[in-house]
């Protein structure tokens, strides 16, 4: 959520039309942290310990780089991150949830986030395609491609 809020605040006036997309995306993503914590608890984990935990170094690097790029370079680059995360989720979430559940014998309730995102993110990918197709500035396209390349490496 903080990355989306930073994106919305940093979008230049020439991209004012994308602000509604960012607001819609914020509404869509709100509460997803709780879904993950619910799944951790359903799998027998400690939701409170998970909420207090710190991210691994790769996750921290990915988020920090995206934040820095939004704040200091070109905020449009954020859509490169969305491309990687939503595209990966749409492609892998449902199969991944099934494989993990079968291997570990966990209940259905431990996979609400992954299973919902396997479906939701397919719609997000379509929305993202519309956004990407609206970007014609070569600097914007280069910025989102650069962040996408970096995030593929860290993700």
What role is predicted for each listed range?
Residues 1-155:
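Non-heme di-metal
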């Amino acid at each position: 959520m903080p990355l989306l809020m930073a994106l919305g605040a940093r979008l230049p006036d020439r991209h004012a039309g994308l602000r509604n997309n960012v607001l819609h995306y914020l509404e869509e993503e709100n509460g997803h942290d709780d879904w993950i914590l619910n799944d951790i608890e359903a799998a027998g984990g400690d939701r409170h310990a998970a909420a207090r935990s710190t991210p691994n170094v790769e996750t921290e690097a990915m988020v920090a780089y995206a934040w820095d790029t939004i704040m200091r370079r070109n905020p449009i680059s954020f859509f490169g991150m969305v491309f990687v995360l939503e595209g990966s989720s749409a492609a892998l979430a449902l199969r991944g949830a099934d494989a993990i559940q079968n291997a570990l014998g966990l209940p259905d309730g431990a996979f609400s986030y992954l299973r919902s995102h396997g479906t939701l993110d397919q719609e997000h990918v379509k929305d993202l395609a519309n956004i990407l197709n609206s970007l014609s500035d070569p600097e914007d396209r280069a910025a989102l491609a650069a962040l996408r390349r970096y995030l593929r490496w860290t993700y």
